């Protein structure tokens, strides 16, 4: 009998009812909520006269609609209603949640790990696709719909069909100036945005082992842009060190680690599909089009039109053409933030490049820490001063310009170097043009006024 993957082990431990191949009822260890996908779910509970089954396993924060310039001055009526409704709901149903502007408030996929709630062995859900971020800790983590949010609130369970298993091995040692954001963008560019459909992806290889927990979260975060249901990694000493000492870390930590150490894939585990990517010669990545798969290594020419891949429409929307390169893009905005790349390490990498320099004329740059703990830590290190002295705006935590649901929208027809995860049409604002890249690439572009090879700077 062959061994099991970490995904198999975790899934099987949480099955309450049902057979493999059909919907199975899973127990949920942590349910994280925010203001956008929870209002209808709470109203459903209210209408049915139900309560939240496990308030202690539920946790909320505000992120999507929160303004980052003046957090309490919410001009948009829908945004204000969602924030006010969330605050009312968590109070009424007795759910632990970060207050608007509170000490732990931030992007949902950042505050769960930072508080120590995210741990190996858990199944974690949230009404948000990038919940997969938590998989970096050796957890099953995936996004759910609003009706499922209500079901989990009421029962602490969810019905799911078990995905297939995919292993992706990142091999080699990257060059200086190449980061985990480049790993995942390269993977999506090579295999496509639907290559992971129907799979739970396990990331492995020496290139993964070498990454920090923050860098690992970046990769798991963008599993969704690869098309996967979720992404996860085997826990190791870096995982345990990250969790240790945090507010909600296990009280008997050594005992917890002894259990977590068993939650790794067996050497003879079987996968439905295996992919490999050598990162040793990988160059910094930049997207040119309107999905994350439309990306290239810096210096490569934009491809010829391929109607099967919607290239013609992408070129029209982005106002670019085949044969150009990333350095030809006329940038107007720089956004360093989002649940993909707004952690302390991301800000530190960007600040190293920015320090002593100034943002190029004609550019607008905003830096948005992903959470209040990150903001405080960055300010203690003086990173805020580095960015402000260079001409950047230093903002309050939130989802910000990752998506057009708050005031931080990129103006129409303006090209933005963005550390976020999606470059769809209108994602950052009506007719905004998004180019995904690492924080270091965004910082280098801010100084130069255009995309440059950050390997020549770091």
Swiss-Prot record:
Protein's pathway: Amino-acid biosynthesis; L-leucine biosynthesis; L-leucine from 3-methyl-2-oxobutanoate: step 2/4
Family classification: Belongs to the aconitase/IPM isomerase family. LeuC type 1 subfamily.
Listed name of the protein: 3-isopropylmalate dehydratase large subunit
Taxonomic superkingdom: Bacteria
One record GO biological process: L-leucine biosynthetic process
Note on cofactor: Binds 1 [4Fe-4S] cluster per subunit.
GO MF, any single term: 4 iron, 4 sulfur cluster binding
Function statement: Catalyzes the isomerization between 2-isopropylmalate and 3-isopropylmalate, via the formation of 2-isopropylmaleate.
């Amino acid at each position: 009998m062959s061994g099991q993957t970490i995904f198999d082990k975790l899934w099987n431990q949480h099955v309450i009812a049902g057979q493999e191949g059909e919907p199975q009822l899973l127990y949920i260890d942590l349910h994280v909520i925010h203001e956008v996908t929870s209002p209808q779910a709470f109203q459903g509970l209210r209408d049915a006269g139900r309560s939240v089954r496990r308030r202690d396993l539920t946790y909320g924060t505000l992120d999507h609609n929160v303004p980052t310039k003046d957090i309490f001055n919410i001009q948009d009526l829908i945004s204000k209603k969602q924030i006010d409704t969330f605050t009312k709901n968590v109070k009424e149903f007795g759910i632990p949640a970060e207050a608007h502007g509170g000490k732990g408030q931030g992007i949902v996929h950042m505050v769960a790990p930072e508080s120590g709630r995210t741990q190996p062995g858990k199944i974690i859900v949230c009404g948000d696709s990038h919940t997969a971020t938590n998989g970096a800790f050796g957890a099953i983590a995936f996004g759910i719909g609003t009706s499922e949010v209500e079901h989990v609130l009421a029962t602490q369970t969810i019905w799911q069909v078990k995905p297939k298993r995919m292993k992706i091995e990142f091999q080699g040692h990257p060059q200086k100036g190449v980061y985990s954001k480049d790993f995942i963008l390269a993977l999506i560019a090579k295999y496509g945005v639907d290559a992971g459909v129907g799979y739970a992806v396990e990331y492995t290889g020496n290139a993964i082992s070498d990454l920090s927990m923050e860098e690992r979260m970046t990769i798991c975060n963008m599993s969704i842009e690869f098309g996967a249901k979720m992404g996860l990694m085997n826990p190791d000493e870096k995982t345990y060190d990250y969790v240790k000492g945090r507010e909600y870390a296990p009280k008997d930590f050594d005992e917890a680690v002894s259990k977590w150490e068993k939650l790794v894939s067996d050497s003879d585990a079987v996968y439905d599909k295996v992919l490999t990517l050598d990162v040793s010669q990988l160059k910094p990545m930049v997207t040119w089009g309107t999905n994350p798969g439309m990306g290239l290594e810096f210096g490569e020419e934009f491809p010829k039109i391929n109607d099967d891949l919607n290239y013609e429409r992408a070129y029209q929307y982005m106002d670019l053409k085949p044969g150009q390169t990333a350095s030809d893009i006329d940038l107007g905005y720089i956004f360093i933030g989002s649940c993909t790349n707004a952690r302390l390490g991301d800000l530190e990498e960007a600040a190293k490049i920015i320090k002593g320099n100034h943002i190029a004329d004609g550019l607008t740059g905003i830096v948005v820490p992903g959470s209040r703990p990150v903001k405080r830590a960055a300010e203690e290190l003086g990173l805020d001063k580095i960015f402000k002295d260079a001409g950047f705006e230093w903002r309050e935590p939130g989802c910000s310009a990752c998506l057009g649901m708050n005031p931080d929208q990129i103006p129409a027809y303006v090209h933005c170097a963005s550390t976020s995860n999606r470059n769809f049409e209108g994602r950052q604002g009506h007719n905004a043009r998004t180019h995904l890249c690492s924080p270091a690439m965004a910082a280098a572009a801010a100084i130069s006024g255009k995309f440059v090879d950050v390997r020549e700077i770091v």
